[in-house]
Amino acid sequence: MYKNLKENYPLYEVRTTESFRALLDEGAELFGDKAAFRFKVKGGEIKSVSYREFRDEVDAFGTGLYELGLGKAHIAVIGENCYGWARAYFTVLATEGVVIPIDKDLSDEETQYILDFSDAEAVICTKNSEAKLDRLLPSLPKLKTVICLGTPAEGEGRYAADALAEKGRELLAGGYPESTPAAVVY
């Protein structure tokens, strides 16, 4: 009645990886230009992002986060399911930070509790979740930075995710300035 799985089906080769960062690099190397994500953009057009492009976008966005001083921060991600949410989540995983995914449908009280208890210093949100965060910010003194996956509301500590990624791309393309110390040897 049942087949013996050990005899009839060989086990698949499994790769081990050292870190999430290494997993992104290996995916880009192994699958290169194959589609990692496909999603609809405004107008109904389907956009495809390859493994290599995704790794490069994660690198750029992560570099933008480091430029803001958030490379090792606790960062919450809240919003509806979209490519930007996935990019934000994977980016924080690939940095030295801690990601805090928050369900967009939680009440204000539950969201506030998670943001406070997790010591979140920044939140990456979709435009639809920004209004909820605006209501909660006065009661969250540790939360200093809001990064919007759309166009952010005006204000101190507000950034657009795409602008941060673009800044990260510029920094990655430019390399280190000659004035940046690389080593201090005595």
Language model feature labels by segment:
Residues 1-49, 53-68, 90, 142:
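N-lobe entry segment of adenylate-forming
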Residues 45-48, 62-106:
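Conserved AMP-binding/adenylate-forming
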